[in-house]
Amino acid sequence: MKAYWYDNKPGDQREPHDSGRPVTVDYLASIGVQYYHFPSLESVNELAKERGYKNRDEIVVSPQAMGDVYEEKVKMFFNEHLHEDEEIRYIRDGEGYFDVRGQEDEWVRIKLAKDDLIILPAGIYHRFTTDDKNYVKAMRLFQEEPKWTPLNRGPDVDENSHRQSYLRTIQNKTVA
């Protein structure tokens, strides 16, 4: 895992967009993002049990796996959105980027690779893309029945109860 401030320069979303300013795991924790490196599935299973993740599936994001809809899907994943549930991803193979909004609404880019697991809290604005190799295989974990309902950013979603709860949670946390 490597986290840093996104450079906000125009260009392909799959490029690193590394500003050269690193972000610490402590900062990620201050915005509710949890990161783990689990070389074994056993560790993932233990975390799933502890956190009550009862369901899981796997997704391969690549032109070979998705065919003609790949570009459309990657663009959809990159639309800024939130979920009303935690988003848990365990990277089984390949690499990808999660971008999350920091405390001042700026983008933090998190590069994940094989054996990295990330938990995004409900209510955090984020987006996802593969890297320039166009391939990632990820396990998705869910507390209840698998669902993936993105709420794209907008004034109405800013007022969403899950968004407001998230903002209250991080309000008093500050880490450099």
Curated annotation (Swiss-Prot):
Keywords: Amino-acid biosynthesis, Cytoplasm, Dioxygenase, Iron, Metal-binding, Methionine biosynthesis, Nickel, Nucleus, Oxidoreductase. Its cofactor is Fe(2+); Ni(2+). It catalyses: 1,2-dihydroxy-5-(methylsulfanyl)pent-1-en-3-one + O2 = 4-methylsulfanyl-2-oxobutanoate + formate + 2 H(+); 1,2-dihydroxy-5-(methylsulfanyl)pent-1-en-3-one + O2 = 3-(methylsulfanyl)propanoate + CO + formate + 2 H(+). Catalyzes 2 different reactions between oxygen and the acireductone 1,2-dihydroxy-3-keto-5-methylthiopentene (DHK-MTPene) depending upon the metal bound in the active site. Fe-containing acireductone dioxygenase (Fe-ARD) produces formate and 2-keto-4-methylthiobutyrate (KMTB), the alpha-ketoacid precursor of methionine in the methionine recycle pathway. Ni-containing acireductone dioxygenase (Ni-ARD) produces methylthiopropionate, carbon monoxide and formate, and does not lie on the methionine recycle pathway. Binds either 1 Fe or Ni cation per monomer. Iron-binding promotes an acireductone dioxygenase reaction producing 2-keto-4-methylthiobutyrate, while nickel-binding promotes an acireductone dioxygenase reaction producing 3-(methylsulfanyl)propanoate. One of its GO terms (cellular component) is nucleus. Belongs to the acireductone dioxygenase (ARD) family. Residues 1-21 are annotated as: Disordered. Fe(2+) binds at H81, H83, E87, H126. It is an enzyme of class 1 (oxidoreductase). It is found in: Cytoplasm; Nucleus. Its EC number is 1.13.11.54, 1.13.11.53. This is Acireductone dioxygenase. GO terms for biological process: L-methionine salvage from methylthioadenosine; methionine metabolic process. GO terms for molecular function: acireductone dioxygenase (Ni2+-requiring) activity; acireductone dioxygenase [iron(II)-requiring] activity; iron ion binding; nickel cation binding. It comes from the Eukaryota. Residues 9-20 have a biased composition (Basic and acidic residues). The keyword Nucleus applies. Its main location: cytoplasm. The keyword Amino-acid biosynthesis applies. Pathway: Amino-acid biosynthesis; L-methionine biosynthesis via salvage pathway; L-methionine from S-methyl-5-thio-alpha-D-ribose 1-phosphate: step 5/6. Ni(2+) binds at H81, H83, E87, H126.
